[in-house]
Structure formats: C-alpha cells, structure tokens
C-alpha cells in the first residue's frame, strides 16, 4: 500500500486544503511523537524524546508551528523551537544537539500560500520510508493525550542562529578568508535572511544583502534561486565579484559571476569535482539526475570521473551517493550535496565550497568551466489521452531510436511521463539547438499520432 501523505520531500500542499490544515498537523505531530516514543530502547531508557522545530518565513508557519508543538506535547515529547531557520540548519542542529528528530515547516521554493512539513532523523538525514509509514499508521488512531504530568515541554533555542552560523563557517578552509570580495547575497525573503549575510560577513566579505525583508507573503516572490534576475541585476549594479542566490528554505544555490552570468547546479557540480581532483588527485564518481545536462556528463567522464544519473529529486541523488560511497552530487535546480560536509543539501555551505574552489584555483567560474558548454535542450510537453499506452507504440519507439542513433555520443533523449497529468515530456539535448529541436519535434509528432 502506497503512502497517503508523505511524498519525496515530506508533506506539502496549499495551506487550508488537506493535508496542510492545523487539525491535521496537530495529529501529525502527535503521530510522529508516538512513533519516536516507541522507538527501540526509548521506553527502557525512560528518556523523553525531544524534537527541534524550525520554519521559513511564511505567515502560515506560526499556525503550523503551534499545531505541531501541541501534537508533540500531547504525545509526551519535548519541543525546542528554532524559529526561522534554513532546512539544512535544522538537520545540523538536530544532529549536533543529539535530539530525537528535527522538523521543518516549509514549502521550499513554492509561493507563500503553500507550506509543508519535513522530518529529519536524529542523524540529520531524511526519515527512512518505514518510519514515515509508521507515522501514517498512527494518524488513523485516536489522539490519547498524555496525562498532565506527562505532557511534553516546549522552549526556545535562543542560540540556534549562532550555532548554525559557526557550523557553516567551519566548512570553509581556515587558510582562506573572503576579505576583498564583494558579494550580493539573495535570501529570497526566506529562512536564511538572518543567518546567510552574517556567515559571509564574518568571513570577511563585503556583503550586499537582498531578499532579507520577509513579511510572511513575499517568500520567493521575484527573488531567490527561482527568480535570479534580481540577483543578476544587483551584481552588475553594485560591481560585485559574485552573487549568491538561495531559495526559501536555503537548501538550493545558484551563483552569478561579476558579468551577471548565471551558473546552475550542473555547472557548480563540475566546479566542485574539478576542485576535489586538484586537491585530492582523484574523484571516483559524482551523481546527477535524469535532467543533468549531457555536457556535464561528457566533461566529467573526460576528467576520469564516473557519472551516475538518479531520478529527479535530491532524495534520490542522496540514495545513489550513499550506495556508492561517493561525496558529490547535484541537481540543475541548485540542490548540491557534499556528504563530507553535511548530511543534506545546504545552499550556504555549497556557496562556501564554490568560493573555496575559486580561492584555491585563482580562477573565475568562467575559467573553471572553460571547455564545458551546456548543450541546448528542447522540451516538448505532449498531452495524451488518459491511460494511453505510449510505451507500446512501435512508431514512438522508432522515432526515439532514430534520434538516439543520430545523436550517438553528442546528445541524448529523455522521455518522462508526468506524475500528475496525462502529459508525456519529450526532452532532447544536442550540441546544436537545431538538432535538439528537430529530433524533439519528430518524437513529439510520433507521440501525438500514436496517442490521439
């Protein structure tokens, strides 16, 4: 039986619509608390579980925080409140403080009217599927509030921001500083607005912060990693050396250089791998996704680095890294994983890794990416009849085979069905845009004819 509420990145939706309602979130807190309290060894030790709750800057965060806190308390679980805190900050603090679990109230890069709940285990990793399944099972049980002397207690973690700032700084080499660098830091009016500027300033940079005036409604609105034009303009206007774009919960990173050129997660992954090769002499492998640009795969293989594609989603990149014992992975959207630095994607830490790579090499981003030109992509969404058997179509298979044969070694074809609507996504990459367009349109035409 599939999970009813948990997706690949927790539970998410529009506030006020199921399941993102205060009554459901209260029951979710209670269910999670009961699962934590029943963990092996917990009852025998007599120790009360403690969870950390952090959130981004959405107006609904206060309501959902109160609901979660009430649910955990009713289950006899103590709560520590971090206030606005990046998702990776909650993961770090949960691990560092030896807590039972961490919870983030955020919908990441989504608009303010959405929100979500994401859990971290005691080691700062996302919850295993089996624990999420146990929480869902508890949601069906009646809420049996603990007796008054068994209720969980709640308190603020007053030094949460300071602890996380120091952790981020600790990932930057002690031999380097950022003196003499002018950085524009875009916090997306989100969870990092209180911490990110301080991290770079305390390392010596001249910081120009933007997206640091949250009002509950403006998170990700025209700023941040999902809207980098604001950062590109600010970098040029302020003659900055570099621009750093985070998203609403600060687990994504995009970078802008002094010319206003934008670098995505695919390109930054290549930069970090090349830096590791220069530092350590070898990188066994790196992980991208089905959407990672083919040019990056080619460049990494030419550098002697194995490259594996995971399903789309940082959760799947992480799974592949752990399975292979590798350190570096990324999505083009800016989720960058460096498992020797953090257990999860962290936009601030990733920015510091990029800055350290530039310091070590003495090069600009453009210079580090010389010879790597992203292949043009053509994406066509083809609407089909619900239930259409596109996989069984010989005409579609022939169109795909023809494109793959023509592009052999110089491009690729990716066909993906949408998980939410009867749409087939046809994506073709090639060295020349004309080739990408021609092959994508040929496949799309075959799909239309076969599924009409």
Curated annotation (Swiss-Prot):
List the GO biological process terms: carbohydrate metabolic process; peptidoglycan biosynthetic process; UDP-N-acetylglucosamine biosynthetic process
Return the broad EC class: isomerase
Question: Which GO CC annotations does the UniProt entry carry?
Answer: cytosol
Residues binding Mg(2+) are 108, 247, 249, 251
Q: Which residues cross the membrane?
A: none
State how the cofactor is bound: Binds 1 Mg(2+) ion per subunit.
Modified positions (Phosphoserine) are 108
Tagged with keyword Chloroplast: no
PROSITE patterns named among the record's database cross-references = PGM_PMM (PS00710)
Keywords of the record, alphabetical order, are:
Isomerase, Magnesium, Metal-binding, Phosphoprotein
The cofactors it requires, by name, are: Mg(2+)
All disulfide bonds of the chain are: none
Reactions accelerated catalytically: alpha-D-glucosamine 1-phosphate = D-glucosamine 6-phosphate
- For this protein, the Enzyme Commission number is 5.4.2.10
Q: How is it modified after translation?
A: Activated by phosphorylation.
Q: What would you give as a GO molecular function for this chain, any one?
A: phosphomannomutase activity
Report the active site residues.
108
Q: Which NCBIfam families match?
A: glmM, PRK10887.1
Q: What does this protein do?
A: Catalyzes the conversion of glucosamine-6-phosphate to glucosamine-1-phosphate.
What does the sequence similarity comment in the record state about its family? Belongs to the phosphohexose mutase family.
Identification of the protein by name: Phosphoglucosamine mutase
Q: Which organism is it from?
A: Burkholderia pseudomallei (strain 668)
């Amino acid at each position: 039986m599939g999970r009813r509420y948990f997706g690949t990145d927790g539970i998410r939706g529009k506030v006020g619509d199921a399941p993102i309602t205060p009554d459901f979130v209260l029951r979710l807190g209670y269910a999670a608390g009961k699962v934590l309290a029943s963990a092996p060894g917990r009852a025998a030790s007599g120790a009360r579980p403690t969870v950390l709750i952090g959130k981004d800057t959405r107006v609904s965060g206060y309501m959902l925080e109160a609901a979660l806190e009430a649910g955990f308390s009713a289950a006899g679980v103590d709560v520590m409140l971090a206030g606005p805190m990046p998702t990776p900050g909650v993961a770090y603090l949960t691990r560092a403080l030896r807590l039972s679990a961490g919870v983030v109230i955020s919908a990441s890069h989504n608009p303010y009217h959405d929100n979500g709940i994401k859990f971290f285990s005691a080691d700062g990793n996302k919850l295993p599927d089996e624990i999420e399944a146990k929480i869902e099972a508890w949601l069906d049980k009646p809420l049996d509030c603990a007796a008054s002397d068994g209720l969980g207690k709640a308190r603020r973690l007053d030094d949460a921001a300071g602890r996380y700032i120091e952790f981020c700084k600790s990932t930057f080499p002690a031999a380097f500083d950022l003196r003499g660098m002018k950085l524009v830091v875009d916090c997306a009016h989100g969870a990092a607005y209180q911490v990110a500027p301080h991290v770079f300033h305390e390392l010596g940079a001249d910081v120009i912060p933007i997206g640091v005036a949250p009002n509950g409604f403006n998170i990700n609105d025209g700023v941040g990693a999902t809207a980098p034009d604001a950062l590109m303009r600010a970098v040029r206007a302020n003659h900055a050396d570099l621009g750093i774009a985070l998203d609403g919960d600060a687990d994504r990173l995009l970078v802008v250089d002094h010319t206003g050129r934008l670098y995505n997660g695919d390109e930054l992954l290549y930069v970090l791998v090349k830096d590791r090769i220069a530092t350590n002499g070898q990188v066994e492998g790196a992980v991208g996704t089905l959407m990672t640009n083919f040019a990056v795969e080619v460049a990494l293989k030419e550098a002697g680095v194995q490259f594996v594609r995971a399903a789309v989603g940082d959760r799947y990149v992480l799974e592949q890294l752990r399975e292979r014992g590798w350190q570096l992975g990324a999505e083009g959207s800016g989720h960058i994983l460096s498992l020797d630095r953090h257990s999860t994607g962290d936009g601030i830490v990733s920015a510091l890794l990029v800055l350290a790579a530039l310091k070590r090499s003495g090069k600009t981003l453009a210079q580090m990416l010389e010879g790597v030109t992203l292949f043009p992509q053509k994406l066509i969404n083809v609407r089909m009849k619900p239930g259409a058997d596109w996989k069984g179509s010989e005409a579609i298979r022939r169109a795909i085979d023809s494109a793959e044969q023509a592009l052999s070694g110089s491009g690729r074809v990716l066909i993906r069905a949408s998980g939410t609507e009867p749409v087939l996504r046809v994506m073709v990459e090639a060295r020349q845009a004309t080739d990408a367009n021609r092959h994508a349109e040929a496949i799309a035409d075959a799909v239309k004819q076969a599924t009409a």
